Amino acid sequence: MAKLTILEFPDERLRTKAAPVETVDDETRKLVDDMLETMYDAQGIGLAATQVDVHRRVIVMDVSDDRSQPRVLINPEYTPLGDEREPMQEGCLSIPEYYAEVPRALRVSLKALDRDGNPYELEADGLLAHCIQHEYDHLEGVLFVDYLSPLKRDRVLKKMQKRHRAMQDA
């Protein structure tokens, strides 16, 4: 396994819409394993392939307290269950050190393929439902800051630009 580099906002590659995975093969499984290692190393609960500059519809996540329940979502599709929405504090490995409340569907129905290409379905609520929607947005080239007001989004952009300058000067 290998740790991958996570792209950071405002990198335009984060805006790329991911293409479906045609075949789940050894290359796909290696990507999944590398993404899980990267996510765990970065202390995240979810990671989309777009965030590591691979523009395929692959997501990994683990919202368990003890980091023991990795989930793999290949070619995911979700549907909100009902109209009820709930704001929840979100962060993002591509926008480090910034958090904001984002309203999302309270419950979702998910269809995806697992690490071996087997189809599965599940219904999710709470943190898992939020994480599914957040990571799915990455596959569409959407970031959680896109849900914020222009003023707040501009503040995040300035903060990230300052962070990048500081990293270059170091």
UniProtKB/Swiss-Prot annotation:
Catalytic activity: N-terminal N-formyl-L-methionyl-[peptide] + H2O = N-terminal L-methionyl-[peptide] + formate
MF annotations from Gene Ontology: metal ion binding; peptide deformylase activity
Gene3D superfamilies for the chain: Peptide deformylase
Amino acids binding Fe cation: 92, 134, 138
Needed co-factor(s): Fe(2+)
Pfam families: Pep_deformylase
GO BP terms in the entry: co-translational protein modification; translation
KW Nucleotide-binding (keyword) present: no
Cited InterPro entries: Peptide_deformylase (IPR023635), Peptide_deformylase_sf (IPR036821)
Source organism superkingdom: Bacteria
Cofactor: how and how many bound: Binds 1 Fe(2+) ion.
EC numbers on record: 3.5.1.88
CDD domains found in the cross-reference section: Pep_deformylase (cd00487)
Keyword Metal-binding: yes
Record key words, sorted: Hydrolase, Iron, Metal-binding, Protein biosynthesis
SUPFAM superfamilies associated with the record: Peptide deformylase
Active site: 135
HAMAP family linked: Pep_deformylase
Family, per entry: Belongs to the polypeptide deformylase family.
NCBIfam families found in the cross-reference section: pept_deformyl (TIGR00079), PRK00150.1-3 (NF001159)
Job of this protein: Removes the formyl group from the N-terminal Met of newly synthesized proteins. Requires at least a dipeptide for an efficient rate of reaction. N-terminal L-methionine is a prerequisite for activity but the enzyme has broad specificity at other positions.
Name this polypeptide is given: Peptide deformylase
